[in-house]
Amino acid sequence: MARVALVTGGTRGIGAAISKALKAAGYNVAASYAGNDAAAEKFKAENGIPVYKWDVASFDACAAGVKKVETELGPIDVLVNNAGITRDTAFHKMTLEQWNAVINTNLGSLFNMTRQVIEGMRARKFGRIISISSINGQKGQFGQVNYSAAKAGDIGFTKALAIENAKGGITVNVIAPGYINTEM
């Protein structure tokens, strides 16, 4: 029986590439998305990967979404925290809404999603959690104080969670890509 992998933001850009690669490697893949229904349906039709719509910035939406995926596909063995947004502007022009949207989606979603799957992984003594950060989480970027802060937080979250679960058969890693020409 194939292991189940869930990729957030898994229907476009980096997430779509990850979803397709996991399917090619033999995983039973689910891809979540937040807003572009047409792109998600096209992705599903072209790749045969089921898609699920929810907002990763909402804990309750993540709980309901994960429950639906696990009911339909089985327990999630691999979680790829990939969903992300930008609301770029210089800090002195940044609104609280721009700050919160990016922090809640790009960092808060790691808690929201991982919290839904970690207990099952611990019980099964197996799990893989991979979070997609960014080079800008390591060096910062003009106009991306919110994004850089969130992506730096992703790195800290991952390191701490890895330590907590190292002896339980769960690996937790972060990938910090450089600049990639893809929409977010």
Language-model region placement:
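Residue(s) in the substrate-gating loop at a strand-loop-helix junction
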Residues: 134
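Active-site loop immediately N-terminal to the catalytic Tyr-X3-Lys motif
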Residues: 92, 139-145, 167-168
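Alpha-helical segment proximal to the catalytic Tyr-Lys
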Residues: 119, 163-164
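Conserved glycine-rich cofactor-binding loop
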Residues: 11-12
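Active-site helix of classical SDR
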Residues: 114, 150, 158
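The beta1-alpha1 cofactor-binding region of Rossmann-like NAD(H)/NADP(H)-dependent oxidoreductases
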Residues: 54-65, 96
